[in-house]
């Protein structure tokens, strides 16, 4: 059997379906990066909790591949990738990557303060709710 080019075909099929992560991986060199005082699993699950609170649309997640791929929301299909690197048993680096500067700043600007314990998940949800009430995005 000859499997040359399968990865390219698979990536093309994912791109056609609208769920490619290649652009997110390609943009990692310009990612917004920060290290947090959590083990990998805790950091990953807390990030998932924040993304769900933000009502981000999660289209791919893989704890094994250390990544989460989202759209900013169901209405805003700008792709954003969150990549996790286990530094040691108690520290994990998070990279927020996107072709859009606004999208990566928006997502990191909401995820990082919760991971930093500067605001609680409940406070973030209240801020998001308040913005929706006033019509601000």
Go through the PLM ranges and name each one:
Residues 7-137:
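Ser/Thr-rich, low-complexity intrinsically disordered terminal regions
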Residues 2-5:
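C-terminal motif of bacterial Sec signal peptides marking the signal peptidase cleavage site
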């Amino acid at each position: 059997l000859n499997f040359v080019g399968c990865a390219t075909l698979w990536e093309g099929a994912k791109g056609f379906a609208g769920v490619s992560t290649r652009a997110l991986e390609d943009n990692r060199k310009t990612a917004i990066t920060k290290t947090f005082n959590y083990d990998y699993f805790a950091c990953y699950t807390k990030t998932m909790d924040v993304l769900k609170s933000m009502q981000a649309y999660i289209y791919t997640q893989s704890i094994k591949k250390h990544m989460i791929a989202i759209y900013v929301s169901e209405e805003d299909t700008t792709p954003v990738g969150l990549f996790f690197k286990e530094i040691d048993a108690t520290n994990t680096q998070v990279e927020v990557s996107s072709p859009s500067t606004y999208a990566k700043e928006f997502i990191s600007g909401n995820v990082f303060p919760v991971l930093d314990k500067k605001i609680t998940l409940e406070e973030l949800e209240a801020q998001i709710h308040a913005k929706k009430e006033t019509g601000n995005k």
